[in-house]
Amino acid sequence: MKKKNMFLQLALTAALLVSTFSTTAYASDVTSTRDIPVGGSGQVEMVGTIEPTILTVTMPTFVPFNISNSLSTQNKVISPRINVKNNSNVPVQVDVAYTSVDISKLKNTTWSNTGAVTANQIAIGLKQEETPGEMPKDLSNARWLEANKQQDMNVLILNSNQEGALYVVGTLGQDVSESATFNVTPTFVVRKTSGTAN
């Protein structure tokens, strides 16, 4: 019986030592301690830090597109599908904050900020994909890029870890120079949102 009790005491002591060391390992970041007697009480101040939410969205850095009046559709742009993926665990919105436009190679051409064009105007915008894998034919719900000015325009809302797509859309007047290039460079901003994607 004595041997059995001695064995239990050793086993209990070993278990307490293991639990003490494992507790100490987890509590290594505690800066100060104090004794609380059995039957007594004491306060422990606990300070929590809320870490910033990491927002990441993957999208291309270069998108080539063609625009031509020879297309019979309202949308005169042939654009690749612009895949956008929210890699965050929270919903995000993708906004255009500013668009740099250089149409200096297009002689006698001006930019339209609204999508309505005269004979010498061009307009470019972004449109959320409505039919999977299908380029838009019309310009309804297009978000028009305003040339060389601040713009706070939402183009896409994505739920957590959701993928979505945009297309470049646009139109041009019949007198806009052909066989010339121009640059449109929108600056995208990703923000946390309380809204949800459709």
Q: Over which residues does each language-model region extend?
A:
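Surface-exposed interaction patch
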Residues: S28-T31, P37, N66-R143
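Low-complexity, intrinsically disordered segments enriched in Ser/Thr together with acidic residues
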Residues: A147-E178
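Short, exposed beta-strand/loop patches in secreted or surface proteins that constitute
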Residues: V47-T49, V84, N154-N159
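Generic detector of isolated residues embedded in canonical secondary-structure elements
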Residues: A15, Y26, P80-R81, Y167
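Beta-strand secondary-structure signal
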Residues: R81-N83, Q93-D95, A165-V169, N183-T187
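Short, polar/proline-rich extracytoplasmic segments that appear immediately after membrane translocation
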Residues: A25-P80, S88, Q174-N198
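Generic short beta-strand segments
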Residues: F62-P64, A97-D102, A165-G173
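Sec-dependent N-terminal signal peptides of Gram-positive bacterial secreted proteins and lipoproteins
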Residues: M1-A27
